C-alpha cells in the first residue's frame, strides 16, 4: 500500500457523503457544516441530514474534516469580527464532534489594519489561545497555511511560531498543510525532493508531530505568485512534486484532501494512483 490516504471535498447535504465515498473509492473527505461565506447559523445541516451521514458511515474507517468559515479573522482590529470568528469556530467544532469528524480546519486571519505583521500575529495568537481554552473536549482545530495578500501563516516558520506561542497540545491544535498555498507563498514544491524538503522544514521548526492532514492541491500559478488558485494534481506548476509529498514516508500515514470538484478530483486521484502517491482505504 503506497502513498497518502487521499480523498475528496464534498458539499452538503451530508447524506450524500457515504455514497460518494463508495463511488470514488476513497475514505477521506472534507465538507462544511454551515455557509462558509457568512457568520451565523446559515446552512447548518438539519438533524435528519446529520443522522443520515452518521448512519451511512457507521462501521467504516473514514476520516473527515470540516472547513471553517472563509471570514475567520482572529487578528481583526475589530472586536466584533474577532468574536464572530471565535463563535463560528466553536459552533463548527460542536457540529463536527456530533457527526464524528476529526476536527475543523481554518485560516487564522490577516495583518491588514495593524502597524506590523508581528502585531497582528500577537493578537491572533492571543485569540487562538482563548479559543482553544473554550473548545469542547474531544475536538481539534487544524491551522491551515495561507498564501495571499496580508494573510498570516504563509510560511512554515510563521505557522510554527503560532503553534508554539499558543502552546496548546497537539491533540487540540494541529497543522494542516495546503500544498498549493505553500507553493504560492514561495516554498517551491515542484522538484523531486519536495517531500524531503518539506519534512525537513517542518522538523526543523519542531512541528512535524503536529501535522495532521494535507490539502493536496496543485497550483495553477508559479511558485511565489501569492494567489490561491488550485489545480488538479499533475496539471499545475507543482506537477510531480505533489507525488513527492504524498508518497513521502513522513506523510504517508496522513489523510489528504483534494479541494476540487468531484470530476477534477477524479483525475487527480487517478494521477496519484498511477504514480504511487495514493491509496483509498
Give the location of each predicted region.
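Hydrophobic faces of well-ordered beta-strands that scaffold small-molecule active sites
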Residues: 4-10, 29-31, 64-68, 104-106, ...
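N-terminal pre-domain/capping segments
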Residues: 1-68, 72-91, 281
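C-terminal active-site-proximal or functional interface alpha/beta core segments in diverse enzymes
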Residues: 135, 262-266
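Active-site acidic/histidine proton-transfer and metal-coordination neighborhood
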Residues: 74-174
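Short, electropositive alpha-helical surface patch
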Residues: 80-93, 116-129, 155-165, 194-200, ...
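Active-site beta-loop-alpha junctions enriched in small/polar residues
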Residues: 7-13, 34-36, 69-71, 109-111, ...
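Acidic (Asp/Glu)-rich catalytic clusters
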Residues: 19-26, 44-65, 92-100, 131-137, ...
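Acidic/histidine-rich catalytic cores of soluble enzymes
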Residues: 29, 130-231
Amino acid at each position: 500500500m503506497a502513498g497518502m490516504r487521499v480523498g475528496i471535498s464534498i458539499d452538503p447535504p451530508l447524506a450524500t457523503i457515504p455514497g460518494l465515498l463508495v463511488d470514488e473509492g476513497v475514505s477521506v473527505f472534507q465538507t462544511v457544516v454551515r455557509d462558509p461565506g457568512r457568520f451565523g447559523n446559515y446552512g447548518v445541516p438539519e438533524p435528519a441530514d446529520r443522522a443520515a451521514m452518521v448512519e451511512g458511515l457507521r462501521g467504516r474507517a473514514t476520516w473527515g474534516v470540516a472547513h471553517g468559515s472563509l471570514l475567520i479573522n482572529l487578528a481583526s482590529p475589530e472586536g466584533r469580527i474577532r468574536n464572530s470568528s471565535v463563535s463560528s469556530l466553536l459552533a463548527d467544532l460542536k457540529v463536527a464532534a456530533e457527526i464524528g469528524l476529526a476536527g475543523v480546519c481554518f485560516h487564522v486571519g490577516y495583518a491588514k489594519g495593524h502597524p506590523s505583521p508581528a502585531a497582528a500575529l500577537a493578537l491572533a495568537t492571543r485569540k487562538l489561545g482563548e479559543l482553544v481554552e473554550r473548545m469542547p473536549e474531544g475536538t481539534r482545530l487544524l491551522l491551515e497555511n495561507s498564501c495571499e495578500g496580508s494573510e498570516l501563516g504563509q510560511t512554515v516558520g510563521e505557522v510554527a511560531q503560532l503553534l508554539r506561542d499558543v502552546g496548546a497540545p497537539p491533540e487540540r491544535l494541529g497543522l494542516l498543510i495546503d500544498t498549493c498555498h505553500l507553493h504560492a507563498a514561495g516554498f517551491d514544491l515542484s522538484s523531486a525532493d519536495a517531500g524531503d524538503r518539506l519534512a525537513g522544514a517542518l522538523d526543523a521548526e519542531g512541528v512535524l508531530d503536529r501535522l495532521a492532514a494535507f490539502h493536496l492541491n496543485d497550483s495553477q500559478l508559479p511558485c511565489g505568485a501569492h494567489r490561491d488558485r488550485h489545480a488538479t494534481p499533475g496539471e499545475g506548476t507543482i506537477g510531480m512534486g505533489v507525488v513527492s509529498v504524498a508518497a513521502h514516508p513522513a506523510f504517508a500515514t496522513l489523510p489528504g484532501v483534494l479541494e476540487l470538484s468531484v470530476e477534477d478530483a477524479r483525475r487527480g486521484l487517478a494521477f496519484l494512483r498511477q504514480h504511487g502517491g495514493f491509496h483509498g482505504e
